Amino acid sequence: LMRKDVDTLTD
């Protein structure tokens, strides 16, 4: 995951 994705995704 990319850091921005961590904020929106939970995988």
UniProtKB/Swiss-Prot annotation:
Location relative to the cell: Secreted, Extracellular space
Organism: Concholepas concholepas
Main location: secreted
Tissue: Hemolymph.
Protein name stated in the entry: Hemocyanin subunit A
Membership in a protein family: Belongs to the tyrosinase family. Hemocyanin subfamily.
Role according to the record: Hemocyanins are copper-containing oxygen carriers occurring freely dissolved in the hemolymph of many mollusks and arthropods.
GO molecular function: metal ion binding; oxygen carrier activity
Cofactor: binding details: Binds 2 copper ions per heterodimer.
Keyword Nucleotide-binding attached: no
Highest taxon above the source species: Eukaryota
Post-translational modification: Forms a thioether bond between 2 amino acids.
Cofactor(s) essential for the protein: Cu(2+)
Assigned keywords, A-Z: Copper, Metal-binding, Oxygen transport, Secreted, Thioether bond, Transport
Subunit and partners: Heterodidecamer composed of A and B subunits, each containing 8 globular oxygen-binding functional units. Heterogenous decameric or multidecameric structures may also be formed.
Gene Ontology CC terms, in alphabetical order: extracellular region
